[in-house]
Amino acid sequence: MKNLFYALKEHWQIYVGLLLGLIIGLLVGVGFTDWKSLVRGLDSKVTDWISSLSTLIIMCFTAVGVMSWKKQKTPDLKSKVAKNIIDFDTHAVLLPSKKFQSIDEIKEYNAIQLKIFWDIEHSLSTLYMFDKSNKQEIDTILGYLLKDINSATSLIEKHARYDEVGRYQLVSLINNGYKNTYPNTTKLFELVVGKSNVVGLNGSS
């Protein structure tokens, strides 16, 4: 139901275009039917053929318009996915530089990381409606990223009662886990956009 809501929200223009095409086609058909009853001398088969052809032409124009809009929309969606991936990498890279005052602050930082992950997943779900290239590989990498976040969550729960020394150790452990994440985000970026990520391991290119 959630994905259906996002589909309707993101692509309402397509559905409206198809609906208008269908309505116009029906109206043209009705118009030709009335015209046929007035001009009794014409062959009904010819009138039906014209009506069907008109409907087909209208639907073809609608389809062409939808395809053109789809072609224009895909690069924008890929850019949105790319931005979310870079945000994910950047948030992870900045982790060691943060001066956390409590375990709760680390927990909040990790929650933001999870939110960015959901942003990636949502933007990819929208992109899949237009382009499903490399979907299987992309979904596999998403699983790896979620696993890394869950590992960080487990570490936070394990160190929840530790003192200040425990906070520094916790950040170090999470950061070590993220070192395995960067190659996956780089690969994800390449699969979606087709070129290397600008943010690599600990900020390197």
Curated annotation (Swiss-Prot):
GO cellular component terms given for this protein: host cell membrane; membrane
What compartments host this protein? Answer: Host membrane
Q: Which UniProt keywords apply?
A: Host membrane, Membrane, Transmembrane, Transmembrane helix
**Topology relative to the membrane:** Multi-pass membrane protein
Span-the-membrane segments of this chain are 12-32, 49-69
Q: What is its main location?
A: host cell
What name is this protein filed under? Uncharacterized 23.2 kDa protein in int-C1 intergenic region
Q: Which organism is it from?
A: Haemophilus phage HP1 (strain HP1c1) (Bacteriophage HP1)
